[in-house]
């Protein structure tokens, strides 16, 4: 059971036309650059602490936390009210794409409240006794953070129901006619759950959270501030223009922004004098196959397959997965959210559709039928 305590320290040629789709089918069948996928997939790095440097990159207080203004305001009010009443904070469910700071927020909450935060994930809670061991060892008003909470087993989830509502554990002792239920009192605590699939949670579990908050993608100016802050911590020299360049290609995700910054820093130190300018940032990101819109090879491949093989769509996600060799769940959870956010992909009742902006970005001329479909 993995537990961490907070106290422990190829783009298509622009000359191609839709009518040439079949003849250029092979353009999307090249070998897949592995480095790019690792750079731009938010879940490529685990949320748990992996080193002192990664720990330093996390803001420790909300006044250091950049972005998510509305969420911070809601939580600040809750923190002040909770501290004045000397109560445990209401249970909190955070949902949204990976890499937006759900674990960081739980650690900040613990710091603001002056309590401990135990960090774990649902897959690590394989047996009921795992969650029981965590709950009985929590101190008053402590925070228990469970990542990927939608993956809890049924038995573990049912143990949480009375724990969340009444701060007690109902444990069945014995079997058959001799079985009896024993209730163990728990100290008041706060459960913070994180998920990328809020719809996968059962209603009984979801309804027991006092707060249900969504984390949104970050704006480019917010990511620019994050890049500058990270560069300062890493003692990397970077210009504001270079920070903006990294931010624009970070898919609205701080984790990706920090990862790209580290790779650009490596490039600047090896190929240049060490200072990161906008030109050097552009060179490095082009080397890593990250285009100015933040699309990597796989993003462009998905869109290219839709355009070349299905005339832009509509096409079902399972069909698209089979045509590209990607997993349908990965397409839905990793690639689609950002493509939809920047307006390159639409979900319709008939399937996925590449928008005119996607056609233009990849160097194609959108057909009239595709324009009418989206009108």
From Swiss-Prot:
Its EC number is 3.6.4.-. Pfam families: AAA_lid_4 (PF17864), RuvB_C (PF05491), RuvB_N (PF05496). ATP binds at residues 57-58, 99, 102-104, 165-167, 208, 218, 255. GO terms for biological process: DNA recombination; DNA repair. Residues 13-218 are annotated as: Large ATPase domain (RuvB-L). Residues 1-22 have a biased composition (Polar residues). It is an enzyme of class 3 (hydrolase). It catalyses: ATP + H2O = ADP + phosphate + H(+). Residues 219-289 are annotated as: Small ATPAse domain (RuvB-S). Keywords: ATP-binding, Cytoplasm, DNA damage, DNA recombination, DNA repair, DNA-binding, Hydrolase, Nucleotide-binding. Residues 292-375 are annotated as: Head domain (RuvB-H). The keyword DNA-binding applies. GO terms for molecular function: ATP binding; ATP hydrolysis activity; four-way junction DNA binding; four-way junction helicase activity. Residues 1-44 are annotated as: Disordered. It is found in: Cytoplasm. The keyword Transmembrane helix does not apply. SMART domains: AAA. The RuvA-RuvB-RuvC complex processes Holliday junction (HJ) DNA during genetic recombination and DNA repair, while the RuvA-RuvB complex plays an important role in the rescue of blocked DNA replication forks via replication fork reversal (RFR). RuvA specifically binds to HJ cruciform DNA, conferring on it an open structure. The RuvB hexamer acts as an ATP-dependent pump, pulling dsDNA into and through the RuvAB complex. RuvB forms 2 homohexamers on either side of HJ DNA bound by 1 or 2 RuvA tetramers; 4 subunits per hexamer contact DNA at a time. Homohexamer. Forms an RuvA(8)-RuvB(12)-Holliday junction (HJ) complex. HJ DNA is sandwiched between 2 RuvA tetramers; dsDNA enters through RuvA and exits via RuvB. An RuvB hexamer assembles on each DNA strand where it exits the tetramer. Each RuvB hexamer is contacted by two RuvA subunits (via domain III) on 2 adjacent RuvB subunits; this complex drives branch migration. In the full resolvosome a probable DNA-RuvA(4)-RuvB(12)-RuvC(2) complex forms which resolves the HJ. PANTHER family: HOLLIDAY JUNCTION BRANCH MIGRATION COMPLEX SUBUNIT RUVB, PTHR42848. NCBIfam families: PRK00080.1 (NF000868), ruvB (TIGR00635). Belongs to the RuvB family. Has 3 domains, the large (RuvB-L) and small ATPase (RuvB-S) domains and the C-terminal head (RuvB-H) domain. The head domain binds DNA, while the ATPase domains jointly bind ATP, ADP or are empty depending on the state of the subunit in the translocation cycle. During a single DNA translocation step the structure of each domain remains the same, but their relative positions change. This is Holliday junction branch migration complex subunit RuvB.
């Amino acid at each position: 059971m993995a537990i961490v305590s907070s106290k422990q320290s190829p783009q298509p040629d622009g000359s191609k036309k839709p009518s040439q789709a079949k003849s250029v089918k092979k353009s999307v069948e090249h070998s897949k650059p592995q480095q790019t996928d690792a750079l731009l997939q938010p879940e490529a790095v685990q949320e748990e602490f992996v080193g002192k440097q990664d720990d330093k990159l996390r803001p420790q207080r909300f006044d250091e936390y950049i972005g998510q203004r509305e969420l911070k305001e809601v939580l600040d009010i809750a923190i002040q009210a909770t501290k004045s009443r000397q109560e445990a904070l209401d249970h909190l469910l955070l949902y949204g794409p990976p890499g937006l700071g759900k674990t960081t927020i739980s650690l900040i909450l613990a710091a603001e409240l002056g309590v401990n935060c135990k960090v774990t994930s649902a897959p690590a809670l394989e047996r009921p006794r795992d969650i029981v061991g965590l709950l009985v060892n929590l101190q008053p008003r402590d925070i228990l953070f469970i990542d990927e909470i939608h993956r809890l087993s049924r038995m573990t989830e049912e143990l949480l129901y009375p724990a969340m509502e009444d701060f007690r554990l109902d444990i069945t002792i014995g079997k058959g006619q001799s079985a009896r239920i024993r209730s163990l009192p728990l100290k008041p605590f706060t459960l913070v759950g994180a998920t990328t699939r809020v719809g996968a949670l059962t209603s009984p579990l979801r309804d027991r959270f006092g707060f249900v908050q969504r984390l949104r993608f970050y704006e480019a100016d917010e990511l620019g501030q994050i890049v500058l802050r990270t560069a300062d911590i890493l003692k990397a020299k970077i210009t504001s223009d270079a920070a903006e360049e990294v931010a624009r290609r970070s898919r609205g995700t701080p984790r990706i922004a920090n990862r790209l910054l580290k790779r650009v820093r490596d490039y600047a130190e090896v190929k240049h004098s060490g200072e990161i300018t906008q030109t050097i940032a552009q060179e490095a990101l082009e080397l890593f196959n990250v285009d100015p819109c933040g699309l990597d090879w796989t993003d462009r491949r998905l869109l290219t397959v839709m355009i070349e093989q299905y005339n832009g769509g509509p096409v079902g996600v399972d069909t698209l997965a089979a045509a590209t060799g990607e997993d349908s769940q990965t397409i839905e959870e990793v690639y689609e959210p950002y493509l939809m956010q920047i307006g390159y992909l639409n979900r319709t009742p008939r399937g996925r559709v590449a928008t005119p902006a996607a056609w233009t970005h990849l160097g194609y001329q959108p057909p009239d039928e595709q324009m009418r479909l989206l009108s």
